[in-house]
């Protein structure tokens, strides 16, 4: 590891595509079924004389690692995810880096929001966990923080923003976790080119709702994969 320990990213390359526990098989008619091919993974590693597998990742990677361990493979699981949504560890690798990035972005938005007297809505990652939104929102002194664990009430959100403007502070910062959703509703998903559904679109929706209800000039920003980069 000499010369690479200070670098971000994955020097060997990586992927989160393909799940041997649920491998898609497409029939001639187009129908897709799924099969468990995890035993083939174990057999291949044995042929290669691999003694053990070190799995570095989030819940998906570690779910696969656990299944392989159940088949007799020696496995070490390393909790690596910006979402900080794994048990058996207080903080996952990558979480603090993502929070630092999000906090920095929120801090920079304060000046433009104040200059133009706007409401700025920032969407951060985290999937169904609100750790990044909560931590970066508190550190960045956001006025409203919306997380998946607590479905929000848009009336209360708008009331908070109006109260802030009425007090003479004519701008506001709203941090939204990508998995957040209002009471009585569900998280928003976007259809990707590969056919998969991914969380996203909440910042745009929240910004639209705030503008419609308050008349305040509102902008939204999605930080996206910027949160996944950078050195450790």
Give residue spans per PLM region.
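Glycine-rich nucleotide/cofactor/substrate-binding loop typically near the N-terminus or early
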Residues: 1-46
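Acidic/polar active-site rim loop that often engages polyanionic ligands
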Residues: 78-91, 114-115, 139-140
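Accessory alpha-helical/coil subdomains and C-terminal extensions
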Residues: 44, 52-57, 63-67, 74, ...
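Extracytoplasmic ligand/sensor domains, especially the bilobed periplasmic-binding protein
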Residues: 15, 67, 71-87, 96
């Amino acid at each position: 590891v000499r010369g690479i320990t200070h670098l971000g990213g994955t020097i060997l390359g990586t992927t989160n595509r393909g799940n041997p526990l649920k491998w898609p098989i497409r029939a001639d008619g187009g129908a897709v079924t799924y099969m468990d091919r995890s035993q083939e993974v174990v057999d291949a590693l044995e042929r290669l004389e691999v003694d053990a597998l070190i799995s570095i990742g989030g819940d998906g990677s570690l779910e696969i690692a656990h299944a392989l361990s159940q088949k007799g493979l020696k496995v070490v699981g390393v909790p690596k995810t910006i979402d900080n949504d794994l048990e058996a560890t207080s903080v996952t690798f990558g979480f603090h880096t993502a929070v630092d990035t999000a906090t920095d972005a929120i801090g920079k938005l304060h000046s433009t929001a104040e200059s133009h007297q706007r409401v700025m809505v920032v969407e951060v990652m985290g999937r169904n966990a609100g750790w990044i939104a909560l931590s970066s929102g508190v550190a960045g002194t956001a006025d409203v923080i919306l997380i998946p664990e607590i479905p929000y009430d848009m009336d209360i959100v708008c009331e908070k923003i109006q109260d802030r403007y009425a007090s003479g502070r004519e701008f506001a910062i709203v941090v939204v976790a990508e998995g957040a959703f209002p009471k009585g509703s569900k998280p928003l998903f976007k259809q990707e080119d590969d056919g998969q559904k991914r969380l996203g679109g909440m910042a745009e929706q929240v910004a639209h709702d705030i503008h419609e209800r308050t008349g305040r000039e509102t902008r939204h920003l999605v930080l996206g994969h910027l949160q996944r980069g950078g050195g450790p």
